Amino acid sequence: MLLMIINGEGHILGRLASVVSKKLLEGEEVIVLNAEKILITGSKEWAYGKYKQRIDRASISNPRRMGPKYPRRPDDIFRRTVRGMLPYKKSKGREAFKGLKAYVGIPREFKDEEMVEIPDAKAGSIKKGMELGEISELLGARLQIGSVIMKKVIHTSGKRKTAIARGTIREGKGRVRINKVPVELYTPELARLKIMEPLKLAGDVINDVDINVRVVGGGIVGQAEAARMVIARGLVDWTSDMDLKEKFVQYDRTMLVGDPRRSEPKKYGGRGARARRQKSYR
């Protein structure tokens, strides 16, 4: 069986995955190194949004469901991309997929091996793009490449009525800020207590992270619930702890899945949103 070792640095993800999938179907074994340096063309905002949406995809009606799963690491993202180009639901595709291996960096056993490049898959001079390693860092993956450790960062968002919140969670000392204000000083008290609910449920987990939340629009309670959702979702993503997720759901499922309900405005011709003045013919 033929073996091909490819240096993924400077290759475009889709083009390289297309070539690799064809080689696998022909019965070859393929090893891809430097997976974190494979490029995705397009703007950073688009690329991050695309993969974040895949990771966040879940059943809204049943948040305790564990799938579908999508990888965060660059080597696993590449493998998943190749898998999508194979007839994976058939035995032929599954057997071919077993011949693919991808690595972050260059492992010691491949230091002295001859690596090839795929000219048709090289990036050339693209104007917009980012490496899989950058995507993985934004998605929260923690990788060690040589002596460099990619720091784990989690980005989350939440919404309640017209309030929209976005937050970032990274390693820290338990500092939580809402619109640059420490949560302990956030006013009014009703909103502060609402925001701190997931922090109290999470327990000691909060001592090892810093959380920054930016919330705009809506009213006091709407902003508080949007910020609460950002914190709860972020802690679940950070810990990957299904017990913590279950705890949030049991306490209040709207921490994770949102609440579309809102007060319907009053309209003319009646005492309320739906009530109408009744006309009597007697």
Swiss-Prot record:
* Originating gene: rpl13/rps9
Ranges for the region named Large ribosomal subunit protein uL13 are 1-141
Q: Name one GO biological process term.
A: translation
Q: Which UniProt keywords apply?
A: Ribonucleoprotein, Ribosomal protein
* Gene3D superfamilies tied to this protein: 3.30.230.10, Ribosomal protein L13
Record-linked Pfam families: Ribosomal_L13, Ribosomal_S9
- Write down the HAMAP family for this protein, in alphabetical order: Ribosomal_uL13, Ribosomal_uS9_A
Q: Where is the signal peptide?
A: none
Q: Which GO terms describe its cellular component?
A: cytosolic small ribosomal subunit; large ribosomal subunit
Care to name a GO molecular-function term for this sequence?
structural constituent of ribosome
Q: Record keywords: Ribonucleoprotein included?
A: yes
- The protein's organism comes out as Methanothermobacter thermautotrophicus (strain ATCC 29096 / DSM 1053 / JCM 10044 / NBRC 100330 / Delta H)
Q: Where is the composition biased (Basic residues)?
A: 273-282
Q: Which InterPro entries match?
A: Ribosomal_Su5_D2-typ_SF (IPR020568), Ribosomal_uL13 (IPR005822), Ribosomal_uL13_CS (IPR023563), Ribosomal_uL13_euk/arc (IPR005755), Ribosomal_uL13_sf (IPR036899), Ribosomal_uS9 (IPR000754), Ribosomal_uS9_archaeal (IPR019958), Ribsml_uS5_D2-typ_fold_subgr (IPR014721)
Residue numbers spanned by region Small ribosomal subunit protein uS9: 150-282
Task: Give the function comment from the record.
Answer: L13 protein is one of the early assembly proteins of the 50S ribosomal subunit, although it is not seen to bind rRNA by itself. It is important during the early stages of 50S assembly.
Record-linked NCBIfam families: L13_A_E, PRK00474.1, PRK06394.1, uS9_arch
Report the superkingdom from the record: Archaea
Q: What is this protein called?
A: Fused uL13/uS9 ribosomal subunit protein
For whether the record's keyword set contains tRNA-binding, the answer is no
> Residue ranges of region Disordered?
259-282
Assembly behavior: L13 is part of the 50S ribosomal subunit. S9 is part of the 30S ribosomal subunit.
Q: Which family does it belong to?
A: In the N-terminal section; belongs to the universal ribosomal protein uL13 family. In the C-terminal section; belongs to the universal ribosomal protein uS9 family.
